[in-house]
Every structure is written in structure tokens, then in C-alpha cells.
Amino acid sequence: SSLKYQLLNPQSGELLAKGLCERIGIDGKFTYKPQLAGKEKLDAVDVAMPTHSEAIQAVLNALVDEKNGVIASMKEIDAVGHRVVHGGEAFASSVVITDEVLKAIEDCNPLAPLHNPANLIGIRACQQVLPGVPMVAVFDTAFHQTMPAKAYMYALPYEYYENDKVRRYGFHGTSH
């Protein structure tokens, strides 16, 4: 399991830092790339990350590190955006995450069993370590919500769509 992250300046859109937590739950590799001059990069450093909560804490620790951090305090984090693979037909745009949104994402787990459960773990881990910070879900499937039925219906029995929402959704919408 992995976690990609970026920290942006909300006023200018400037990239402050980015990186990757890999092998969460196994042996943990942490990459941190601050974009400010004079800050030291960490590349695939061994860091214990038994859960997503520890991975997120490693990211936050790097962001506020006295020597190589790019912000002074976690209080500077105004919001967190989460890429969520599957929003089904429930979400045609990005949304502020509420308990109802979490439930709707969970309801889409059968449509993205490898991704949505991990997305939910990441969201809940962020909520745990950044309580009170607004979280936003950005859905890969939202970009393609304007497809007409003739484009998204598969040549399968219609009951698969009615009962299980099996249809073409289109993915990688956050790349467009």
C-alpha cells in the first residue's frame, strides 16, 4: 500500500513539498522532496509505517521538521484533498467529506475493491491526525459523469446495471 502527497501554498498554488510513502504495513519507504531552496530531500528512507496513520504522521513530521520542513506548524494546513478512485453515480464533482460521504464511498467498495477501502483508510487516518481540518474527496469517476447512457452501458444484462451499478465510468479523471 502506498500514499502519494503534495503540499501546496493555498494562495499561490506553489508546490512546497511532495513525496511518497511506500510499503505501508510491510517495511516502509519514505520519500520527501521539499521544493524550497536549502531543504534536504529524503529518498526511499526506511521508516516504520505499520499503518496509514503512521505514514501520514511521517509526512506531517517531515513537513514541520525544524531543519527541512516547509511549514512551521500543522496549523498551517487549511484543508486536505483526497483522490478517491470510485464515487459511482453518487458524485459528479468533488465534495467536502462528511459521515454521509464516507458511507457513500464505502458503498462503492464493490466497484473498486482494491482502491476505495484504502482511500477510506487514508481519509480516516488524516481525520485522526488532523482533527477539525476540512477534508475533500476528489473522484476519478466525476470527470466522466456527463457520458450519455449509450456510451456508459455495457452489452450485459441490464440488471447488472440496475442491481450492481456495473457500467463504464471512465477513470483517471483527475488527470484531465
Regions found by a protein language model. Give the residues of each.
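Short capping/connector residues at structural and topological boundaries
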Residues: 13, 26-29, 102, 110, ...
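Short glycine/proline- and acidic residue-enriched helix-loop micro-motifs
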Residues: 41-46, 104-109, 162-166
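ATP-dependent carbohydrate kinase catalytic cores
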Residues: 116, 120-176
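Short beta-strand-loop/turn "lid" adjacent to the catalytic site in phosphate-handling enzymes
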Residues: 63, 67-115, 136, 143-151
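A structured beta-alpha segment of the ubiquitous adenosine-cofactor-binding alpha/beta core
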Residues: 41-73
